[in-house]
Design a protein with these regions (language model features):
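Hydrophobic alpha-helical membrane segments
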Residues: 1-234
Length: 234
């Protein structure tokens, strides 16, 4: 397939708008899909030590599932609920490779955070006793936040579009990652604008006792498909 286009940053509004239009076609089923994935993530998160790594890996399959049903909604106006698990039936190996990369990034992030905290606040025993200087705690916290942000941005740049490209275009992992990176690097303005809008929507969704997230979360899960369509086909 062709390489991604460079588009105006203002197209980010179209990506959010396209996701909203898709959501309105079958809101109930999409909310149900998001709730199911949420329950799965909560269950995985309760597994000691490896829960976070499994969440990072499975999220790729969730994004692929939403990309697939987004295409079904766009073309047919509906989807079968079981199609949210399409990634476990098709292109499973390729998605698993991307998921494994996500798990490794999560592991590196966690280990680096521990090293930063221990290195800046002293030995573990003093940390356990909370015998810490306020400035040290703040410095450690800011360092961890900065590291997590950098790793998150880099990982997202390489993988944001990869699940859609794998499940919809049968792209191999290496090329899917390359195309995702090209899409990001050629549309940094749009990526930043889109991220800010998604963050704002998430915050707004939290206001009414988190009930707004029932709408916001499944809608945001459709955004990667909207970006994929705009960058590669318009």
């Amino acid at each position: 397939m062709a390489e991604p286009q460079a588009l105006p940053a203002g197209n980010a509004k179209e990506w959010i708008g396209a996701a909203w239009r898709l959501f309105k076609l079958r809101p109930g089923k999409l909310i149900g899909a998001a709730l199911l994935f949420g329950a799965i993530n909560i269950g995985l998160g309760m597994i000691p030590y490896i829960g976070g790594l499994l969440q990072a890996a499975i999220s790729i399959f969730e994004i692929a599932g939403f990309a697939f049903i987004a295409k079904q909604l766009e073309e047919e106006g509906d989807f079968e609920f079981g199609q949210i698990f399409i990634g476990f039936q098709e292109n499973t190996k390729s998605l698993a490779i991307i998921g494994a990369i996500g798990a490794v990034v999560a592991l590196i992030s966690n280990l680096a955070a521990i090293i930063l905290i221990v290195g800046q606040v002293g030995d573990v025993s003093s940390a356990a006793n909370l015998d810490l200087d306020e400035a040290q705690m703040m410095s450690a916290g800011l360092s961890v936040m900065a590291l997590s942000l950098i790793l998150g941005i880099v990982y997202s740049a390489f993988t944001f579009l990869a699940p859609a490209l794998i499940i919809l275009e049968n792209e191999p992992p290496k090329r899917a990652i390359l195309l995702s990176w090209q899409g990001f690097s050629r549309n940094i303005g749009g990526a930043v604008f889109c991220s800010l809008m998604m963050g704002l929507l998430f915050i707004v969704g939290m206001i009414p006792i988190f009930l707004g997230l029932l709408v916001v979360m499944p809608m945001l899960m459709l955004v990667p498909y909207a970006v994929y369509r705009d960058l590669f086909f318009k």
